[in-house]
Amino acid sequence: MPNWTSNTLKVKGNKSDRDAFAKSMADFIKDKVKPLVAEWVASNPDKCRKEYERSVTPKIDFNFVIPMPKELEGTTSPRPKTRDEIMQLAKDHSWDEESLKWRLEHALSDEDAARLDELKSRFGYDNWYEWCIVNWGTKWNACHSEDCDVVETAQMTIYRFSTAWSPPTPFVHALAIAFPKLTFRLEYTLEGESGKWSMTGDPEKYEGCRKALKEQNERLEQAAIKIISSL
């Protein structure tokens, strides 16, 4: 399980602009929620239907402004090794026969390797994890529990939600670009760390944020490869 980051996103601006933002995101999310089976709806109280909709309808969806390519869904990180790569690694490792056999049996096929190469060429990444870290700032979409909600005040709209390990800074930058009339203030709390940002529609800041996360992710990836190669 990850360390969870508690996020509070404060959206400030004219009420009409905030309402337009809230409606556009709610409509996007609503289209993704799987409807209940008609027979179930007919045989259960209305409060059950409302509870279902509440439990499966998130308040925030990062795909709203930064959609993850569907082709990356179900991919694996880090990328599996091909048979040739495994045999090359075996020269520098004292794997026993069973260990080497297992690795070869689970090796990446040439066909799958070509498919992953194509994904990386198209999207910059061949797996969902690395793409999410750089484009969303966290490995999963926004996570919601009973303490996650939306609060409306006269001055702002407040969204509370959780993310894994880190705050979704690139997502908030992208919101600010998509809705330049609004100001987005993200406050987060992680174990031993907290922070605040106020963001407006500045594309350069968004690209700078993505670049920093990309460089960080590449460093982590190289460290992970060294660890995995030593096993």
Residue ranges of predicted features:
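Intrinsic low-complexity, intrinsically disordered or marginally ordered coil/linker segments
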Residues: 1-231
